[in-house]
């Protein structure tokens, strides 16, 4: 029988990366999966719920009994990786504790700054506990990985990469649909803006004196 968890995932982070934590929680909890995949796997349309993130639930700090309980009742651990979190004692303790629970395969890394395995404390993004525990080779989702020309699309790809790992589905199974939805939104926004500009231009012409209207129409 599968264990029941209160939280789908626990986000571990350093306070310098709090904005990324909030953004990630919002992205994951709000992600709508396709009806086809939901039907195949028995998911809800928003399957990654709820996410435990300290600012909205409890003040971060030491690895208190309360935080330990939240880790115990979380199916996955998501570590926001940056040079700040790499130097954080408490991020290391949260990783170590989750590892001790026997859920190492459910530890996921989301890289927002720095470089993996750089060997330089100023740029290294993985906490040293990762090497100390001998965790398997890690390829975290990296928001700065240059796959596309546009940085916002690289970030979206990293979000979907993490989502695919959390749900245990092929990346392409959800990425292609996600891209189509993004492009559809961009087209809709562009058409909406053009429509507004066209309306404003028409209103401007209507409100001009007659001789100005004639000049505008002639041009």
What function would you assign to each model-found segment?
Residues 5, 45-47, 210:
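A short, polar/charged loop/turn motif at coil->beta-strand junctions and beta-hairpin connectors
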Residues 77-79:
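Inter-motif core of Ras-like GTPase G domains
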Residues 205-219:
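Ser/Thr/Pro/Gly-rich low-complexity linker/stalk segments immediately outside membranes or between
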Residues 1-29, 50, 56-70, 83-89, ...:
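C-terminal interaction surface of TIR/SEFIR-family domains
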Residues 74:
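An anion/phosphate-binding loop that grips the pyrophosphate of nucleotide cofactors and donors
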Residues 30-51:
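Short mixed-charge
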Residues 44, 82, 88, 217-218:
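Residue-level signal for threonine
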């Amino acid at each position: 029988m599968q264990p029941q968890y209160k939280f789908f995932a626990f986000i571990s982070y350093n306070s310098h990366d709090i904005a990324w934590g909030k953004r990630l929680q919002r992205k994951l909890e709000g992600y709508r999966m396709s009806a086809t995949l939901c039907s195949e796997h028995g998911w809800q349309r928003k399957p990654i719920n709820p996410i435990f993130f300290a600012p909205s639930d409890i003040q971060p700090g030491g690895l208190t009994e309360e935080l330990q309980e939240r880790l115990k009742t979380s199916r996955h651990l998501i570590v926001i990786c940056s040079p700040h979190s790499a130097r954080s004692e408490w991020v290391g303790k949260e990783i170590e504790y989750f590892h001790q629970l026997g859920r190492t395969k459910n530890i996921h890394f989301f890289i927002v700054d720095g470089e993996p395995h750089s060997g330089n404390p100023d740029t290294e993004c993985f906490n040293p506990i990762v090497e100390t525990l001998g965790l398997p080779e890690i390829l975290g989702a990296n928001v700065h990985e240059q796959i596309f020309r546009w940085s916002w699309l690289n970030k979206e790809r990293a979000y979907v990469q993490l989502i695919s790992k959390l749900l245990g589905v092929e990346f392409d199974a959800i990425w292609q649909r996600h891209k189509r939805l993004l492009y559809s939104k961009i087209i809709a926004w562009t058409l909406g803006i053009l429509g507004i500009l066209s309306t404003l231009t028409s209103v401007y012409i209507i409100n001009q004196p007659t001789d100005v209207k004639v000049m505008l129409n002639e041009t």
